[in-house]
Amino acid sequence: MPDDESESRIFRPAGISYLRIPAGDPQRTAAFYESVFGWSVNLDRPDPSFEDGTGHVIGHFIPDATAAGEAGVRPYIYVDRVDETLEKVGAHGGAVVDPPCPEGDLWVTTFRDPAGNVLGVWQRGPRD
């Protein structure tokens, strides 16, 4: 999936560049991230692969892994508008866990994807 240009962004020391996302139904979970965040998804395998919207992170949706829920490390995805993103989350089978709250000049919130994973989204600047 990654091309030569994105490989130079992915294969760099000390950068987070690969995620394994638990997914009881990998096809449904992959469709969620594709619809909500515009990730590039490859569904032609039992554990669909993805590349995020920046080309810095790749990974797989893992069918036999259990979602951590609210425990464990929680990745946060940067978005332009948290409110619009949360609307998309709900429309595509996810749910809001915590409402958006300010942290300095940021707005931060968490959601649960269709597989039960809890992740966060955040935006910089005013929430309008």
Spell out what each predicted region is.
Residues D25-S40:
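Amphipathic alpha-helical segments
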Residues G38-V73, V118-R124:
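Conserved short beta-strand elements that form part of the metal-binding/catalytic scaffold
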Residues M1-R28, H56-V57, V73-P75, R124-D128:
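N-terminal beta-strand motif that seeds the catalytic metal site of vicinal oxygen chelate
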Residues R45-D47, E103-W107:
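Short acidic/glycine-enriched loop/turn segments that link adjacent beta-strands
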